[in-house]
Amino acid sequence: MTFATKYGPWALGAGTSDGVGAAFAKGLAEREVNVVLLARRRAVLDQVAAAIVSQASAQTRTLAVDLAEPGAASAIAAATSDLEIGFLVYCAGAYPDFKPFLANPIEAAEAMVQRNCMVPMQLCHHFAPAMVEKGRGGIVIFGSGAGLAGGPNMVAYGSSKAFDMVFAEALWGELHDKGVDVLGLILGKTNTPALRQLEYRRGQISSPDDVPVGAAAVDDVIAEAFENLTNGPTWMVDEDMRAAVQMMA
């Protein structure tokens, strides 16, 4: 069975405007799966779509939705009702701002939980039944090393990523014997535009174009993801992340 037969004909990628999300979408298209590109900024999504179409034969569709807003999952479901979605990858999720929990309004934490917990859960509940019925499909939920243990200045973020990991593990337990691959992909520091901006604001790097110390390359992360789609329920990306987990065990 080809990749496209198992996971196609369409994939939905949430958070695919740049970084690991855009790279994952490109990887899907290279494997002949059509991709719905989803994020807040339509203009950027259109650029990603154009790049994909110029390099692969897959079709694309762009969908601009703010995942922090209530009703986001319903809007996504309505906008993709004419498509057969065989693969869902959820890599949206804001980086922490490294402020104490009490220094931010509660609305900031609520938006984080909406984006990182509620929407992926709702999308899985919507799209997974058709995958189960066909006996094939895939779901990848991006997690973070911040979800492995609580830490200051990442209270809502780390907690939401802990949810993502446990949710993926539990969903794998229910779906893997039904032909649906579920993977919680746990990332460490990754050289994305969002991380570079964050580290630049914190004074950790001198320019937003600098590579943060110890950050994994996006292409390496995506290569590991595709190589381990069937190795759920979780996969720790990068040797440094796996070593850190071993030390915590």
PLM ranges: what are they?
Residues 124, 160:
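Active-site helix of classical SDR
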Residues 102-122, 136, 164:
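Catalytic Tyr-X3-Lys loop
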Residues 184, 200-248:
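C-terminal helical subdomain
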Residues 10, 15-19:
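Conserved glycine-rich cofactor-binding loop
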Residues 31-47:
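Conserved glycine-rich Rossmann-like NAD(P)H-binding loop of the short-chain dehydrogenase/reductase
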Residues 144:
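Residue(s) in the substrate-gating loop at a strand-loop-helix junction
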Residues 69, 74, 78, 87, ...:
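Conserved mid-core segment of classical short-chain dehydrogenase/reductases
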Residues 14, 85-93, 116, 141:
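Rossmann-fold scaffold of SDR-type NAD(P)-dependent oxidoreductases
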